[in-house]
Amino acid sequence: MGEQTEFEPIQLSPLDQAIPPVYIRILLCFSVVNVDRAISQLQTGVSSLLSALPFLSGDVVRYTAPGKTKWLYQLCPPTHQVQATGVLVVKHHQMRCMVDEKRFAPSSTSHIPLSPFAEPARPAPIFRVQANAYIDGITLGFAFHHIAVDATGMGVIISELARHCRSSPPPSLLCPDYERATRQLISNSRATECSGLDHSGDYISCQALSPPAEGSEDASPSIEISTETRTFVFPAARLESLKNACIEMLPTLDQQQRQQNPCLDEPARTKVPWLSTNDVFVALLWVCLTRCRYQEDQNSGLPSDEHTRICMGVNMRSRIQPPLSADYLGNAILSLSFKLNVNVFRRTQVTNESIEGVDSKDIEHKQWLATICRVARNIRRGVNGMDDSYFRSVVSFLEDSSDCRLFDYARCDFCVPSWRHLCVYHADFGEMGRPKSLEVFDVPGDGSFCILPQHYGAAAPWELLLGLLKA
């Protein structure tokens, strides 16, 4: 683990550089019978993983290119001081980590590596693992530098590490040369013609036109970290039923919209033939949280001059031409950000038919269903617009900016990354087996929520981690 790993520096893409210098930090919890043997397998697995992907042992390094006025980032071989600590740290605890057969004892930040913020002016590790060995189990704390890896890439690395922990893993499916070539491909994916899209409202300048003098304070922005989180569980079957009900209602809403607003522009009149479960789930959350934030007057409804804005991650790997590999580790997620008037979130009247003899609860149920459907339809339209042209437009904007730009999360009332697709709970680590639970650290800001990875097994519920500021 202490060997120096060499690789050629990898230049990061504009999408990597539009990410703040923070770490994605999570904790995986395992119930283990033979802890010593599991730790030995883990050490071998980490060493094998770094041999296959040596850049994971490196650092994110900031620099300025000749003739350029803005900071750039690249992945470089580790410094001697950083490498001496090793990528994997093992800490032994002479106590139990499990409260009962299913629940683990509360953890703390001492169980995960690194701090949430990387120091931009200094080389910062790309990847670190901390193994906490207990009498009855192991918890693995991971830290991934977000400039180098997005959440999808994080899931790929965890699955790959699990594969290397099992005895005699097959040849690696991941290739360092592909990582380098793909980041260059993204950098070259400029728009061939003017798209007419303005991204300036979504990104903010993160520094002065020239780097600060040596020894001066860094100008990079910080992110407020929430001090409280709450986890909510939603049955998968209930969400599937809600999605199907919304899809059935789409033609009715489309017809009603055309009748009430015959002069709508083309994007607003575009039919949405289907909705994903994620669309409907985010719509449900957006409706509930917006109505909690705004007071509704009995006569006038919600305030007509207020808007609520959401941003949600859209994985662009399969949406661009040529498509990127699903196993690409770098940042390939763009934030979809748009706002709606808060009156969109009131109960929607969906029919003019007589309601005589109809139960009032059924009427109210249908009206709220229509509201959720209407919001989900707006979300799906936004996601559908995230295509190859949009991707190239964003890359061009970031490349042409005279200074570094970061996506402006502060403009959003709600921020929704979805990790549902990550196969973390499916990762078999050999002696450790599959993770029993997962904890996410550093959920930023009030109104930020994360849709957690799907548990192993059929009909796994949807889990939501909601970030709240203390009152």
Curated annotation (Swiss-Prot):
<keyword id="KW-0012">Acyltransferase</keyword>
<protein>
    <recommendedName>
        <fullName>O-acetyltransferase astG</fullName>
        <ecNumber>2.3.1.-</ecNumber>
    </recommendedName>
</protein>
<comment type="pathway">
    <text>Secondary metabolite biosynthesis; terpenoid biosynthesis.</text>
</comment>
<dbReference type="Pfam" id="PF02458">
    <property type="entry name" value="Transferase"/>
</dbReference>
<dbReference type="InterPro" id="IPR050317">
    <property type="entry name" value="Plant_Fungal_Acyltransferase"/>
</dbReference>
<keyword id="KW-0808">Transferase</keyword>
<dbReference type="GO" id="GO:0016747">
    <property type="term" value="F:acyltransferase activity, transferring groups other than amino-acyl groups"/>
</dbReference>
<comment type="subunit">
    <text>Monomer.</text>
</comment>
<comment type="similarity">
    <text>Belongs to the fumigaclavine B O-acetyltransferase family.</text>
</comment>
<dbReference type="InterPro" id="IPR023213">
    <property type="entry name" value="CAT-like_dom_sf"/>
</dbReference>
<comment type="function">
    <text>O-acetyltransferase; part of the gene cluster that mediates the biosynthesis of astellolides, drimane-type sesquiterpene esters that show antimicrobial, anti-inflammatory, and anti-tumor activities. The first step in astellolide biosynthesis is performed by the sesquiterpene cyclase astC that catalyzes the formation of drimanyl pyrophosphate from farnesyl pyrophosphate. Drimanyl pyrophosphate is then dephosphorylated by the sesquiterpene phosphatase astI to produce drimanyl monophosphate which is further dephosphorylated to drim-8-ene-11-ol by atsK.</text>
</comment>
<dbReference type="GO" id="GO:0016114">
    <property type="term" value="P:terpenoid biosynthetic process"/>
</dbReference>
